[in-house]
Structure formats: structure tokens, C-alpha cells
From Swiss-Prot:
It comes from Mus musculus (Mouse). GO terms for biological process: autophagosome assembly; cellular response to starvation; positive regulation of autophagosome assembly; vesicle targeting, trans-Golgi to endosome. The gene is Wipi1. This is WD repeat domain phosphoinositide-interacting protein 1. InterPro entries: PROPPIN, WD40/YVTN_repeat-like_dom_sf, WD40_repeat_dom_sf, WD40_rpt. Pfam families: PROPPIN. It comes from the Eukaryota. The keyword Cytoplasm applies. Belongs to the WD repeat PROPPIN family. Interacts with androgen receptor (AR) and the estrogen receptors ESR1 and ESR2. Interacts with WIPI2. Interacts with WDR45. Interacts with ATG16L1. May interact with NUDC. Residues 386-406 are annotated as: Disordered. The N-terminus might form a beta-propeller domain involved in specific binding to phosphatidylinositol 3,5-bisphosphate (PIP2), leading to the association of the protein to the membrane. Association to the membrane can also occur through binding to phosphatidylinositol 3-monophosphate (PI3P). The L/FRRG motif is required for recruitment to PtdIns3P. It is found in: Golgi apparatus, trans-Golgi network; Endosome; Cytoplasmic vesicle, Clathrin-coated vesicle; Preautophagosomal structure membrane.
């Protein structure tokens, strides 16, 4: 999930971050600023370690890291139509591609890299960056809203199917075919996301009051959650936990909502033969005679847990991650801070804020500046990659740190027969051809 910080209105301090995103398995955070971009590891609560930082590209508004690999994709306001792919550990550019209009968002997994423009989506094979398909004539999508399953065995893509309603188009990124359309909401879509296996799809409309979860690829509604009733809000991020047990939503308000995916059963169990059980049964029966909108509201589940922010109105993104063996709620905001909360997976309730990190102070924390007394960290990655490097052999036969490809060559397809490259291993890297590309019409279209 990535967010681009909006321009500050008169009287408000300009956002410190231009963009920020968690990687696919929520183990890393990337931020973009006017000076460049930074990558952080999320392996510890107390200490925020900066993995890499670069000032070579100014005014970054999109930065995406592929899992925990050395592949990072960057787009700058200085060249908003150009995508740059880097191997940050080596300090080298892998390739860059230019498109016909401004790039609005980028999504990637171990098989596919998607580039979303306002009226088209480009689907690349991440192994060699070959353009596989261009999805044209999509409804105007000015925010670049789209989602890609991180499960490379299906690589499902979801994007808005209408400008006026909440229709979702579900597309198979491997077979390059449309799977189905889902009538998710009456209003325009604001957020969509897949769970880690690609078996569920969650969505929210611009009203931000109701969040729905659908089965994939069937498109059947599984859950319906109500975020609130009093006011409409702008949902800024929507994300499943890696085990798909929870769904987290943040907005322009001061509250982050966490919903629990209760186990679905085919039939409701019999109520106990007590007065309260009888009344509960009568209550559920009565909902069948209420107007549809009221009946739906009565059957919507409320938040299992919440996180309270000390601000509202700022752009932010949230995620759920396990850090040091405990479930945590993480919120990154455009003011340049990362907030870490404890989540009680059994009882829910209000999450407890346990740490606040500054994302602009090179990995030191605000609350524990005495941590500077710890042993000094290794040299920065900028210094590391400047040293002569030796190629480290991979555990997969035929692969080196470069992915086994020489300059200008691509790994033969048969070398992938044993399975995809383990891109979460920093010693491996997708076998991408070093290239310069332009995508302005010479494409396979749909």
C-alpha cells in the first residue's frame, strides 16, 4: 500500500514525506521526499534501521521495494512518465521505461510488475521486464487505484470498472484474461486490496462507511464491516494481516479500525434455550421485515480493535505485522513518523501506542535518543555499494546475485522449471535485462 502526500492547504505545514509504502509482506517501509528516498527494516520495535538511502533522484513520489530483495522501483516528479528500476545494494540501475502519461501507481510481486496510468495499465514480466499486456480503455482512474495479489501463483489484479459506481474488475495477471466484475459498492471506489494468498479481496467506497470482503475468483461477498455511521471519511489504506485473520483500515480521521475475519459457517448454530437466546433469534428474524438498507446495517460487524492517532487530516497508511513474535499495528504518516501499537488478537479493544519513530532522522528514534550510546551501526548502504563487490553464489543452481544473466541476456525459460526465484533472499535478484524502454504504442493491447 502506497500513499502520495497531497499539497498542504494554506495555513498548514507542508507534508514532510511525498510518499510512503510498506512492502508486500510488511517487513520494510519505503519513504520518498524532495531529497530522495529511504528504505527501513521493520524487524524491531525499539530501533528503526535504515537499510538504504539515496539522494540521486530528487522529488520522489513513488517508491516500491520488492519484498526484502534489492529491487526498488522509483518515480520522480522531475520525470513523472519514467519508471526507474534499481538494484540498490549494487548501486546500479537495472532499467527504465517511459510511458505516454504520468505514472500514478506501481504494484509488483515475484512474477509481475504493474504500471498504472490514468486510462491504462501496463503488465510486465518482472524476470526480464518484457511488456506482456496493456489493458487499455479502462475508466478514468485519476488516483491510480489498483491492487495486485502478492501470491505469484495467481497474480490477480483488481482495478475500478466504473467512474460512477463501485464496480471492480478482477483480472488474472498470469493468464492475462479478465476473470469477473464485482458490484462492490454503490459509490466510487476509494480502496481495494488482496489478502496474502489472493483468495480474498476487500474494498471501500468514497463514503468510507462500509468495507466489504469478497471471495476470489468467485466474487461472492463474504464479510461486511461498518467503519462508522456519523460521517463520511476518506479511506487512505486498507490491508489484510498476513494470516488473513484481520483487516485494517485507516482514513483522514484520528481512528484506525481493525476488523476480525470470523470463521464462516454454512449455517447459524441453534440459539440456547434461554430468554436471551430466544430474543436474539426473534431479533434476527425481524431483520427480514426491515427495509434492505436497515437490515444490512443490523447485520454488519463492527471494529474488533481500534488505534487512536494524535492527529487527523494527514495522509497516512497502516499495516498489521508480527514484530518480535507479537502482532503490531503500524501507521506511517505524511508528517514523517511511524507509530507502532500493540494489538490484542484475543480481546481486541483499543491498541496501545508503544513507540514513535522519526522517519527523517536517519533511523534514530524520538523517544529513545539514548540509544545513540549503542555500538555504531555498519556503514550506510551508499558506502557499502561503492566498494568492489564479489558475486555471491545462490542456493538455487544456475543463479548468481545478478540472477544468472549476463548483460543484455535473459535467463532461458527452462531454468525456471524448478520454481520462481526466491526474491526475498537478498543474495538473489530477478534476472532482468539491462535496458532502456519506451511504452508509447508498441504494445500488446486488450
Amino acid at each position: 500500500m502506497e500513499a502520495e502526500a497531497a499539497d498542504a492547504p494554506p495555513g498548514r505545514v507542508e507534508a514532510a514525506l511525498s510518499c510512503f509504502s510498506f512492502n508486500q509482506d510488511c517487513t520494510s517501509l519505503a519513504i520518498g521526499t524532495k531529497a530522495g528516498y529511504k528504505l527501513f527494516s521493520l524487524s524491531s520495535v525499539e530501533q528503526l534501521d535504515q537499510v538504504h538511502g539515496s539522494n540521486e533522484i530528487p522529488d520522489v513520489y513513488i517508491v516500491e521495494r520488492l519484498f526484502s530483495s534489492s529491487l526498488v522501483v522509483v518515480v520522480s516528479h522531475t520525470k513523472p512518465r519514467q519508471m526507474n528500476v534499481y538494484h540498490f545494494k549494487k548501486g546500479t540501475e537495472i532499467c527504465n521505461y517511459s510511458y505516454s502519461s504520468n505514472i500514478l501507481s506501481i504494484r509488483l510481486n515475484r512474477q509481475r510488475l504493474l504500471v498504472c496510468l490514468e486510462e491504462s495499465i501496463y503488465i510486465h514480466n518482472i524476470k526480464d521486464m518484457k511488456l506482456l499486456k496493456t489493458v487499455l480503455d479502462i475508466p478514468s482512474n485519476p488516483t491510480g487505484l489498483c491492487a495486485l495479489s502478492i501470491n505469484h501463483s495467481n497474480s490477480y489484479l483488481a482495478y475500478p470498472g466504473s467512474q460512477s459506481t463501485g464496480e471492480i474488475v478482477l483480472y488474472d495477471g498470469n493468464s492475462l484474461k479478465t476473470v469477473c466484475t464485482i458490484a462492490a459498492h454503490e459509490g466510487t471506489l476509494a480502496a481495494i486490496t488482496f489478502n496474502s494468498s489472493g483468495s480474498k479481496l476487500a474494498s471501500a467506497s468514497e463514503k468510507g462507511t462500509v468495507i466489504r470482503v469478497f471471495s476470489v475468483p468467485e466474487g461472492q461477498k463474504l464479510y461486511e464491516f461498518r467503519r462508522g455511521m456519523k460521517r463520511y471519511v476518506t479511506i487512505s489504506s486498507l490491508v489484510f494481516s498476513m494470516d488473513s485473520q484481520f483487516l485494517c483500515a485507516s482514513s483522514n480521521t484520528e481512528t484506525v479500525h481493525i476488523f476480525k475475519m470470523e470463521h464462516l459457517t454454512d449455517s447459524r448454530p441453534e440459539e440456547p434455550s434461554t430468554w436471551s437466546g430466544y430474543m436474539g433469534k426473534m431479533f434476527m428474524a425481524a431483520t427480514n421485515y426491515l427495509p434492505a438498507q436497515v437490515s444490512d446495517m443490523m447485520n454488519q460487524d463492527r471494529a474488533f480493535a481500534t488505534g487512536r492517532l494524535n492527529f487527523s487530516g494527514q495522509k497516512n497508511i497502516c499495516t498489521l505485522s508480527t514484530i518480535q513474535k507479537l502482532p503490531r499495528l503500524l501507521v506511517a504518516s505524511s508528517d514523517g513518523h511511524l507509530y507502532i501499537y500493540n494489538l490484542d488478537p484475543q480481546d481486541g479493544g483499543e491498541c496501545v501506542l508503544i513507540k514513535t519513530h522519526s522517519l527523517l532522522s536517519s533511523g534514530t528514534t524520538e523517544e529513545n535518543k539514548e540509544n545513540d550510546l549503542r555500538p555504531s551501526l555498519p556503514p550506510s548502504y551508499a558506502a557499502t555499494v561503492a566498494r568492489p563487490s564479489t558475486s555471491a553464489a545462490s542456493t538455487v543452481p544456475g543463479y548468481s546475485e545478478d540472477g544468472g544473466a549476463l548483460r543484455g541476456e535473459v535467463i532461458p525459460e527452462h531454468e525456471f522449471a524448478t520454481g520462481p526465484v526466491c526474491l526475498d533472499d537478498e543474495n538473489e535478484f530477478p534476472p532482468i535485462i539491462l535496458c532502456r524502454g519506451s511504452q508509447k504504442g508498441k504494445t500488446k493491447q486488450s
